[in-house]
Amino acid sequence: MSKILKIVHLLLLCACSVFAYARTARVYGYVVDQDNIGIELANVVVLNTDKPIGTATNKNGYYELILDEADTVVLSYSMIGYTTVQQRILDLREVLNINVQLLTDEQVLAEIEVRGIQHTQGTMDRIDAATTRVMPDATGGSIESLLITFAGVSQTNELSSQYNVRGGSFDENSVYVNGIEVHRPLLIRSGQQEGLSFVNPEMVENVAFSAGSFGAEYGDKMSSVLDITYKRPPAFEASLSASLLGAHVYVGHGDSTYSQMYGLRYKTSKYMLGGLATAGNYNPTYFDYQTYITWQTGPKWQMSFLGNVSLNDYRFTPDSLSESFGGQEAKNLTIYYEGQEKDRFLTAFAALSAKGKVSDEVEIGFDLSGFYTNERENFDITGEYVLSNGSMDETQPSNATGEEIDPNAPTVDALGTGLFHQHARNSLEAGVITLAHQGTWQRGNNTLIWGISGQAELIRDRISEWEWRDSAGYSLPNNGLPMELYYSMRGDTSMTSARLQAYIQNTHKWNTSSGQWIFTIGGRLQWWSWNNEVLPSPRASVEWIPGWKRDLCFRLATGLYYQAPFYKELRDTITDEFGITRFDLNHDLKAQRSVHVVLGGDYYFRAWGRPFKLTAEGYYKYIDRMESYSVDNVRVRY
């Protein structure tokens, strides 16, 4: 009996020992950040154990651990980007709630340099916008000054930001800022009047340019497209510069939900223009103010506002001109002026945009923009000129002496004398309002984009411009007949019109054993109420990046492009028997049309410690329904 009691007693002692060893404790709680928001996937680990024991928090920051009871337990709470917290627990028993707050771990990392090559998709080429800040440029550091480095792009006036692309005119190039097309003043006739470019280089993040065969998302111009994207500053930044030719101030600030930029530019070219052949008092001033503001209205929606006001004030009082030309038998033309020119060009632009994601695959946007221009061109200039052999310095008195030159007075070397009078009282006022919608659907290797827009235009134009020349004294004495003018243009017109535009385009990327293929096909459709013309514009491209040479890219692009008239093309002139030209607006004018075919390739390589891109392109352009025009300085007159 005693043996049985001993055995039972021994079994009870073993059971109590096992029970005591199996007793556990439960530790639970939340891991949160400085804003008391749960941190997902934070690590909770027991340090003072022989084998690793731990868990990770869920999306709400909750964790739970089942541990053996112990006298001392050390828990470690950690997460990338946060400081690690250790919690020491004395006499761990049963259930314990521990909530931990992790602070942001701010560390200054050593500077690193990341290099990579991104293939240009389609015919759009990327430009480093920072380059314009160090390039000498008479227009004040414009983005357009970089375009002349591209094949097929030329510039005929260094005082202007306008350019020609593959034989096209200045009016055949479209410019977009944040996906919205911007317009230029319409009356400007010379680079001296033009002033600053619309694009402020300090506010630019991305620049893309295409010299032909561009996609369906870009509008209805025949030659090229320049696409500008403004940046969102992540923190405070500012810049200031000043010189004898002008000044600019830029201030930007931003965070994760809000950003703002302000740019103010001033330019004067009086010192540069003083070196022109026509001596006189040049006093041009150019002013430009821009602002770009973005803000988050929710987790998936963003609003933005872009505003611009530009004022060009051009004043010129000519004095004299002396030019020699010819070879062995050199001639000299000397002109003494009276009168002055006063021009004023005021433009304003504003755009309100909303963009958001309605799902993981679909993103949509809406834009409301307006453009206004008020332009005045006034001059009355008379001149007395003498054409002679050789220099006029010894045969004619200087205009600075105050002596009046008699154009009929005999001179030793004079071949001819005469008078002229140039007069203009031109004004133009225009407004454009545009409402647009665009969207993107992306799934896998397929991207579909679409857009639709409506535009209303209101323009009022008054022109009274003429020139009179008398090189033979035929107007004095008066013979009673009407005096003919050398040139005259008169008109007073107004127009209102509406445009509807829509586009759709699909891009598919296909990876094969031979490399990556990118197929893009789309189309654009527009209608204009002025001539009731409907214009379909199909466009397509294919690209191939060979698998055996990833730094090569070949492409073929084509499309049918229409350029509907805006306003200047509509002027229909009629000249009467007295040389007076009057103009009216042509309701039957059709859009100009062009077919583009571009075949090219890019080769990316590194040399001398920096990246290079070698591009070769061949293009074909077929143009019909072309409107004839004349070019005088930067003015295009149809």
Language-model features, listed with the residues they occupy:
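Membrane-embedded beta-barrel scaffold of Gram-negative outer-membrane proteins
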Residues: 365-369, 588-638
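Transmembrane beta-barrel wall of Gram-negative outer-membrane proteins
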Residues: 239, 243-266, 279-317, 341-364, ...
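Short, acidic, small-residue-rich periplasmic hinge/interaction motif at the N-terminus
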Residues: 32-34, 42-49, 78-83, 93-136, ...
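Face-selective signature of the C-terminal outer-membrane beta-barrel domain
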Residues: 296-311, 340-531
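Periplasmic N-terminal accessory/gating domains of Gram-negative outer-membrane beta-barrel systems
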Residues: 83, 88-90, 96, 118-173, ...
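Short, acidic Ser/Thr/Gly-rich low-complexity loop/linker segments typical of extracellular
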Residues: 49-62
